[in-house]
Amino acid sequence: MSLIEKLPDLNAVKGGFGERLAAYYSKTVFSDAYVLHDVLIDGKDEHKSQIDLIIIAASGIYVVEVKTFSDAKIYGDGRKRDWQYYLGGHRYDFYNPIMQNKKHVEYLKKMLSDFAKVEFYSVVLMLCDGCKVSNVNRSDRVDTVVCTSLPAMNRAMKMFLEANETKLSPADTRKIYDYIKENQEQGKEARRAHKEDVKAYRQKVQTERENRVCPYCKKPLVLRHGQYGNFYGCSGYPKCRYTEK
């Protein structure tokens, strides 16, 4: 059984938590930030993206994915499609939230393509009993963080704030906020269609797992023999270096 099948919808689990989180961070991290919660946007590729939290500040746009796993330990690799969730002596696989939020950022960038010089940051907040994650960023540029507590999230956002020399004007942050708010998908029908889309996408991911397909370039994975044992690697190597056990 996959974690996706075991757990209820995360939006239902969180309830009003996301709104409280948004209010908290709009006041304590960025005094001049605009905050949007539970935003549904059109990716222009027949898919939509539901974003838990968007913080629009002078230092850039922070796209936040919140995962709530009570009494569980999580292990993941930023380069791997599947992460592991351990609870009650059992292991469950679930889709890499770094990859998930990367898609959110990609869709939001498309939506805001008319706004130049905007920095985007991916923040994954894992509320769980323990979390060990490796290879969060795939290059020397750090634009993604995985946090396991609200204070850690606070520190990460401050790190981005201090490191970014490009600043948006108050007028620009307001324009971006208004644009997202006015152009987000709204209404029950849009939400229903998105749920059906997510269901189909999860089935697609499961099929790719079973058929050993690379999540990045969609080429077949092939069995390889390494120094530390056998593993599956992308047939597109060396252009694509995805591997899995």
List where the protein language model places each region.
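TOPRIM-like Mg2+-dependent DNA-processing core and adjacent phosphate-binding/basic surface
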Residues: 79-81
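Surface-exposed interaction regions that form or flank ligand-binding interfaces
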Residues: 1-50, 56-61, 67-70, 75, ...
